[in-house]
Amino acid sequence: VALLRAVLGDGDLHGRLRAMKRYFLLDKGDFLVHFTDNAGEELARRAPDISVSRLQSLLELSLKLSTASTDPHNDDLTCSLERQGIIHQLLSIHVTGGAKGYAPADADLDLDENAAQMTPKEALRLTGFETFALDYNAPWPVSLVLSRRAITKYQLLFRHVFHCKHVERRLCEAWQTHQATRAAAAQTTGAGDGGSLGRAYVLSQRMLHFLQNFTYYLMCEVVEPNWHAFETALRDAQSVDELVDAHERFLDACMKE
């Protein structure tokens, strides 16, 4: 009971969990907009050429300029660059026996270790957008709930949502470019949306529409319902073990859905 009080009271577990939702699940993603605007040029470079310390400085600046500036625990948020893309990271987890909680137990996957490893050439081609991840330094006793295993799941969820947001941003930039190109084409040929230019515009709009709906599904149909169930379980928890179990169920549900 004393440990439970320490986790919930002095450790401010509820506040830290809300922070994890804000940062890793982009519940309030205004800080990410600031960060992408400031760090976009750096993230577009090849991963080996990126300065992580510069990214960390830009992340801290973005937090100060966003609604997260009032979070007393935002100093515990850091960033890193993973050594592989998210697909290969998930494959590595599955192959090495860490797939429990990430994939159905009866998943029909016949993989070997070579399939899960990136070649050196593939790794060199990765950009910062493909390898960027957040990290969180949870102090004792909150680290009992926000364990390294739990934070790894948060990182996987973040990388997935971050990639969706990045692609959405690029599609919006493509739309802006298309507007300028269409205007130039109309002046020179007298045609606006005909031919291949029109088909490219329609395709980009369909892609953008799909991605926006997919992101909405992730946040409103997956994260929010599971989060509400998780909050109920937190209020009813009578021990730290029950807190950990409820947290793991929340993360596993988000990963699977």
Residue map of PLM features:
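Extended, charged interaction scaffolds in large complex subunits
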Residues: 1-257
